[in-house]
Amino acid sequence: MYATAHFDGERINIEHRIYAVTPNGDRQYIDPSKDLKIDFWRYERRFARPLRDRKLDRIRPILGMVVERYPTFTELQVEDYPLIITRQGPRKAQRQVIAAISRAEVEEALK
C-alpha cells in the first residue's frame, strides 16, 4: 500500500523509453501516443517493463505494432530515465540502455 523508502544517493528509475534501432544505427523513439496509441501508464506498465524484463509473450500485440511501424529495426533498446535522491532534492542521473532485444527475439515471440 505504501511506497518503499528511498535514501540519499539512491538511483530511482522514473521512466523508460524504447528505441527502435535501424540497420545504420539510428535510434527512433517509439512514442506511446503517436506510434502505439496508448497513454503513458499503459506504455510503462504494459510495454516498457515487460520488454525490459524480456517477457515478450505478454506484449505480442504491441510488438506487432512496433514491427508494422518500424519494419527495418534490428534491435529494441530500453533506456531508463533516472533520478538520484539527494538531501537537496532529486537530480537527474545519466541515462543508460538497460535492455537490448534483438529483432530475432521479437520475431520468435510473434510466432
Task: Annotate each predicted stretch with a short phrase.
Residues F7-K111:
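Extracytosolic and intramembrane catalytic regions of membrane-associated proteins
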